Amino acid sequence: MVSLEKMVSFLDRVPSHILVVIDEAYFEFGNKISDEYPDCTKLHYPNVIVLRTFSKAYGLAGLRLGYAIGPEYLIQALTKVKLTFDPNLAAQIAGSAALEDEDFLQKTLDNNSEQMIKLMNAYAELGIKAIPSVANFIALEMKDESMVEYYYENLLKK
């Protein structure tokens, strides 16, 4: 996890003519784990755009709904090159409802945290090193290629 201090230090060193795009697709998961997880939407730089999605924590992946936050001139430039089709009305309503339903989001994040602990413990019992994650996925460190092939083949069968 990158601290707010490190993020600001980085952004302060980027020349203003260089565009910085920050993908915060997993922001809600990181923010649940630590209050120190940086919310880059609160940073105001003339060359920074922050992207967020409803696909992850809100569970609305099929709607292909997200948003960008940044200086007005950058958002206007993005609008000129965006796809012709805006999200449909159902997606817009679902996104609005998702933002208002804080209880659902909290339950989702709590459930993710609980299941993450169970998975980390299960992998530890199997002798597999799982790299801790604040999101809704885990990276596994396999000892060698044969171990990768073994799990790959067995998971395909299930």
Predicted features by range, described:
Residues 47-131:
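PLP-dependent aminotransferase class I/II
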Residues 5, 157-158:
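PLP-dependent enzyme catalytic core of the Aspartate aminotransferase-like
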Residues 2-6, 33-36, 62, 91, ...:
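Residues at alpha-helix caps and immediate loop-helix transition turns in enzyme cores, especially N-
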Residues 26-28, 84, 139-140:
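Short histidine/acidic/glycine/proline-rich micro-motifs that form metal-
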Residues 1-20, 24-55:
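Active-site pre-lysine segment of PLP-dependent enzymes
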